[in-house]
């Protein structure tokens, strides 16, 4: 069978933990609060990643587990109840409280699901309390969002209404633009998960067609199928081609006429080609190595190879759901090494041996590689940037052309 070469490896990994997803989730749902049950290290990570000043009133915090908790000398459940109740008393605007597990809370087997049920009962429905794990022991950082959305699914109302459900966090402006385009295709019943208010949960049922906006929502997709929804398989909306195919998949499911699809999307594709042109000049023929971290690697590789002319040395991904990623896999060049999992030392050896022009990697690896003269791109920046949709193709390409330009300037 032709197509990329699918490989696997395991060993030491270099990734952020799932707590990082709180940074974009708390911006999406301003009436929700994310209470991490973890260590001071967890608190420092979230504070630094979010860039919030210490005097601000952010919508996240950390219930610190100290030495007595970790040694089992204190009742951590009792202390957690006290912290949560004090928080809700001080912040009456909170409507959903997420209790977020961490590596320390999982090591001591702290049962956050029991705490969430107990607090929900005591608060008598005034605040919904849910829990999920943001631990990095077995997961990568984007899976924090998958856990948070999966925790909300039992609370979604049931409905047989014919509707399109966009699943995965997008920047508000990007989502508004995509909804506007779907409206022009006569798809008007559109809901989002996560919603912009945590209490405005979408209904789901046999009439629901799910279109994933992010490739890392495997558990969420499975649970939505269990609720009767149908999950479409499509390339993800990164780059002009992927975004068009993504929208076409939904439009055909809603039986939109091909001529109407073309009339709405073709002008956008023409503009995208103009926006891509200056970046393609920089990227064409350059060799790129994508280390596994965000699970965006396959859609990005497809975009960079097919629309920007880059050569793929290796495409790493933390996990590969072959069913969900089937359309992306089919669009990659024959023989491209796609490596699921990570042995970071072996991958770094392959980076040094292959001498790529650009490496997409985590922040912890970027500086050492830059010191060796290899241009890098932080993978986490791709998660925080508004890169989805045909309109954003030029901005997405610029995220890769910029480090190459900078590297060339420094070299001269």
Curated annotation (Swiss-Prot):
Domain of life here?
Answer: Bacteria
| Complex and partners | Protochlorophyllide reductase is composed of three subunits; ChlL, ChlN and ChlB. Forms a heterotetramer of two ChlB and two ChlN subunits.
EC class: oxidoreductase
Q: Which UniProt keywords apply?
A: 4Fe-4S, ATP-binding, Chlorophyll biosynthesis, Iron, Iron-sulfur, Metal-binding, Nucleotide-binding, Oxidoreductase, Photosynthesis
UniProt-listed InterPro entries:
LIPOR_BchN/ChlN, Nase/OxRdtase_comp1, Protochl_reductN
Q: Which SUPFAM superfamilies match?
A: Helical backbone' metal receptor
Family named by the database record: Belongs to the BchN/ChlN family.
GO BP annotations listed: light-independent chlorophyll biosynthetic process; photosynthesis, dark reaction
* Cofactor: binding comment: Binds 1 [4Fe-4S] cluster per heterodimer. The cluster is bound at the heterodimer interface by residues from both subunits.
Cofactor names: [4Fe-4S] cluster
What this chain does, per the entry, is described as: Component of the dark-operative protochlorophyllide reductase (DPOR) that uses Mg-ATP and reduced ferredoxin to reduce ring D of protochlorophyllide (Pchlide) to form chlorophyllide a (Chlide). This reaction is light-independent. The NB-protein (ChlN-ChlB) is the catalytic component of the complex.
Catalytic function, reaction form: chlorophyllide a + oxidized 2[4Fe-4S]-[ferredoxin] + 2 ADP + 2 phosphate = protochlorophyllide a + reduced 2[4Fe-4S]-[ferredoxin] + 2 ATP + 2 H2O
Keyword Oxidoreductase belongs to the record: yes
Q: Which organism is it from?
A: Synechococcus sp. (strain CC9902)
Q: What is its EC number?
A: 1.3.7.7
Q: Which Pfam families match?
A: Oxidored_nitro
User: Single GO molecular-function term?
Assistant: ATP binding
Keyword check for Nucleotide-binding, yes or no: yes
Q: What is this protein called?
A: Light-independent protochlorophyllide reductase subunit N
Q: Which residues bind [4Fe-4S] cluster?
A: 17, 42, 103
Functional pathway: Porphyrin-containing compound metabolism; chlorophyll biosynthesis (light-independent)
């Amino acid at each position: 069978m032709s197509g990329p070469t699918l490989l696997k490896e395991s060993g030491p990994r270099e990734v952020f933990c799932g707590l990082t997803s709180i940074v974009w989730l708390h911006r999406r749902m301003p009436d929700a609060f994310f209470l991490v049950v973890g260590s001071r290290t967890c608190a420092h990570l979230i504070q630094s990643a979010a860039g919030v000043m210490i005097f601000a009133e952010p919508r996240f915090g950390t219930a610190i587990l100290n030495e007595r908790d970790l040694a089992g000398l204190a009742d951590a459940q009792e202390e957690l109840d006290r912290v949560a109740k004090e928080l809700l008393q001080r912040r009456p605007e909170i409507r959903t409280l997420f209790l977020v597990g961490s590596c320390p809370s999982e090591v001591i087997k702290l049962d956050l699901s029991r705490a969430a049920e107990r607090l929900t009962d005591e608060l008598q429905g005034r605040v919904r309390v849910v829990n999920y794990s943001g631990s990095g022991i077995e997961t990568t950082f984007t899976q924090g969002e998958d856990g948070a959305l999966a925790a909300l699914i039992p609370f979604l109302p049931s409905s047989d209404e014919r509707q399109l459900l966009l699943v995965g966090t997008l920047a508000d402006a990007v989502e508004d633009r995509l909804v506007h385009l779907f409206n022009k295709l006569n798809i008007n019943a559109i809901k989002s998960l996560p919603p912009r208010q945590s209490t405005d949960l979408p209904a789901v049922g046999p009439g629901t067609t799910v279109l994933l906006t992010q490739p890392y929502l495997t558990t969420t997709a499975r649970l939505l199928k269990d609720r009767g929804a149908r999950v479409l398989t499509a390339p993800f909306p990164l780059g002009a081609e992927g975004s068009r195919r993504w929208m076409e998949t939904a439009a055909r499911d809603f039986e939109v006429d091909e001529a109407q699809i073309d009339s709405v999307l073709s002008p956008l594709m023409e503009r995208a080609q103009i926006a891509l042109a200056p970046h393609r000049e920089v990227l064409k023929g350059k060799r790129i190595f994508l280390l596994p971290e965000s699970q965006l690697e396959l859609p990005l590789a497809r975009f960079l190879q097919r629309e920007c002319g880059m050569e793929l040395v290796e495409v790493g991904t933390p996990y590969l759901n072959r069913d969900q990623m089937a359309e992306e896999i089919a669009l990659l060049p024959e023989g491209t090494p796609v490596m699921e999992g990570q042995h970071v030392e072996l991958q770094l050896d392959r980076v040094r041996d292959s001498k790529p022009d650009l490496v997409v990697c985590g922040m912890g690896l970027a500086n050492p590689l830059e010191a060796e003269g290899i241009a890098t791109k932080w993978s986490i920046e791709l998660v925080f940037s508004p890169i989805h949709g045909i309109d954003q193709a030029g901005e997405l390409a610029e995220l890769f052309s910029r480090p190459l330009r900078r590297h060339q300037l420094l070299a001269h």
